């Protein structure tokens, strides 16, 4: 029939029992007459355990050696899953990222996929085998092993689906699909039957952990239909595709949130045409992702600049700014931790003015101070105190009527 790429995350392969369950799910797809490529993550908390081992040796281990270490986690999973499939009577072969032909840029820890040579995988598929590929890893032009960073296995799966021209890419997780918000925190959250690439990309960028943004970008660019499903349950998941026809004109489709956000403020920057370019180029060269940006001129000659980052990046951000003080020519810097980002997302915002005003009204009525704001055509993001994050999410979820059958859609 066709080719299906399946991806199973760390929780889904977290034990031998779960790997055997995954093998059964793979076999079901094979029995449907499809060729199957399976991408897997390291088992359970293996990656975290490997990081802990490294930190017992060195507080600042070389990035190359970290990639060498971390890629061993997926190698365990691929071999065990291939063994399970063969034991159940289905020929399977496992490949590391570099054996699978995945070439990346020469960056350790957060490389991007540049190309995938599919001949080896295609040969095995033509012979009727199931191909099991390690997610999260590849090889650069110098023959060095690299990792793809957070969400790398999602990206591997969608990139393989694009390169192999697969009909579909199924992302199996420990949840049954994409929800209007995280059901662990908001009990009234409901699963979406379908969602557009653009909406999913915004949700992923804004902290919805079910899919990595790079994976959604790949899917959108190559027209790959995604389905987020549970590896433990049999119910349908959430389809992610280009167009979604909704039963109702829902303005907002989801509320996303992310904790551990820090605001960095740079005081007394020269109020010149090049000062912003210089500071953000410097941060980008050090692979520091800046999110929400606010600029306020203090006088004709100087300006203050605030931007939000992930708290994990604070130490490096401050070091980069301090090391480049002469270049950037600022007067001072400070940081504010203990913040969170809360966002609403929905394509309906394009044709419905007043959404941001309603959001701010809801937050104000609940005594929640907004510290920073960012908007696009289909989202509004705010930075608030981390202690008020869940209160804000619950209030917005209720105000925009995201509970119940209204969130369902047709496809």
Curated annotation (Swiss-Prot):
ATP binds at residues 7-10, 41, 173-174, 179-184. The record marks 7, 74 as: Contribution to the catalysis. One of its GO terms (molecular function) is ATP binding. The keyword Transcription regulation does not apply. The keyword Disulfide bond does not apply. It catalyses: L-aspartate + ATP = 4-phospho-L-aspartate + ADP. Its EC number is 2.7.2.4. Lysine-sensitive. Keywords: Amino-acid biosynthesis, ATP-binding, Diaminopimelate biosynthesis, Kinase, Lysine biosynthesis, Nucleotide-binding, Repeat, Transferase. One of its GO terms (cellular component) is cytosol. Pathway: Amino-acid biosynthesis; L-lysine biosynthesis via DAP pathway; (S)-tetrahydrodipicolinate from L-aspartate: step 1/4; Amino-acid biosynthesis; L-methionine biosynthesis via de novo pathway; L-homoserine from L-aspartate: step 1/3; Amino-acid biosynthesis; L-threonine biosynthesis; L-threonine from L-aspartate: step 1/5. Substrate binds at residues 25-30, 47-49, 74, 125-126, 150-153, 289-291, 295, 355-356, 369-370, 376-377. One of its GO terms (biological process) is homoserine biosynthetic process. It comes from the Bacteria. Pfam families: AA_kinase (PF00696), ACT_9 (PF22468). Residues 264-338, 344-411 form the ACT domain. Belongs to the aspartokinase family. Catalyzes the phosphorylation of the beta-carboxyl group of aspartic acid with ATP to yield 4-phospho-L-aspartate, which is involved in the branched biosynthetic pathway leading to the biosynthesis of amino acids threonine, isoleucine and methionine. Tetramer consisting of 2 isoforms Alpha (catalytic and regulation) and of a homodimer of 2 isoforms Beta (regulation). This is Aspartokinase. It comes from Bacillus sp. (strain MGA3). The lineage of its organism: Bacteria, Bacillati, Bacillota, Bacilli, Bacillales.
